[in-house]
Structures are given as C-alpha cells and as structure tokens.
C-alpha cells in the first residue's frame, strides 16, 4: 500500500543529505519546505495531499539535486548527466511501484 511513510522511507537518504529540504506533516497532508541556507525564510513550501504527489515532488527534487552535484553548478547539464540522473531515479520508481502489488 502506498503511504506517506513509505515515501519518506524511500527518500530518507536523500532527505538526510539535503539540508535545504524538509518534509513536515500537517493537517492537510505533508508539506515540503525548501530553505535557503541559514535564512529564516523558506524559498517555498508545497503541500502534497496524496502519497503519489509527495513521491513525484521528491523525485523531481532529487533529480535536480543530482544534476547540480554532477555539474557542481559550474557547467551546463549534458545529455549524459540527465541519463545518469534518470537511472538513479528509476530505482526510486521501482521501489514505489512495488508498493502497488
């Protein structure tokens, strides 16, 4: 069964490493908050009302983070960078799809 808890379990390693991302439980679902370094203001906060919404958001965030790490923010993203990031994302998708069965 797909649950918010399973999404958090799948992305635990990523969330532990990315100090600017935080996921908070709230009355409407889960809120993904992005911080900007040590600023007391967040960059954004996006509500996910379903586990699928949270999964897709975190997968996108993970992919973006992976591309930044690959380029170190100093060069354009190449096709190979995108291919490697997609391969890593595929393992998350496979774990998520296992929850349907």
Model-derived segments and spans:
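Residues that form generic nucleotide/phosphate-binding pockets
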Residues: 10, 14, 57, 95
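Compositionally biased, intrinsically disordered low-complexity segments enriched
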Residues: 23-24, 97
């Amino acid at each position: 069964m797909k649950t918010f808890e399973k999404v958090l379990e799948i992305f635990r390693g990523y969330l532990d490493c990315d100090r600017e991302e935080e996921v908070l439980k709230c009355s409407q679902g889960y809120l993904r908050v992005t911080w900007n370094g040590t600023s007391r203001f967040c960059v954004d906060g996006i509500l996910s009302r379903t586990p699928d919404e949270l999964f897709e958001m975190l997968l996108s965030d993970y992919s973006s983070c992976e591309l930044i790490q690959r380029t170190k923010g100093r060069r354009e993203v190449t096709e190979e960078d995108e291919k490697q990031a997609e391969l890593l994302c595929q393992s998350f998708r496979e774990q998520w799809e296992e929850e349907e069965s």
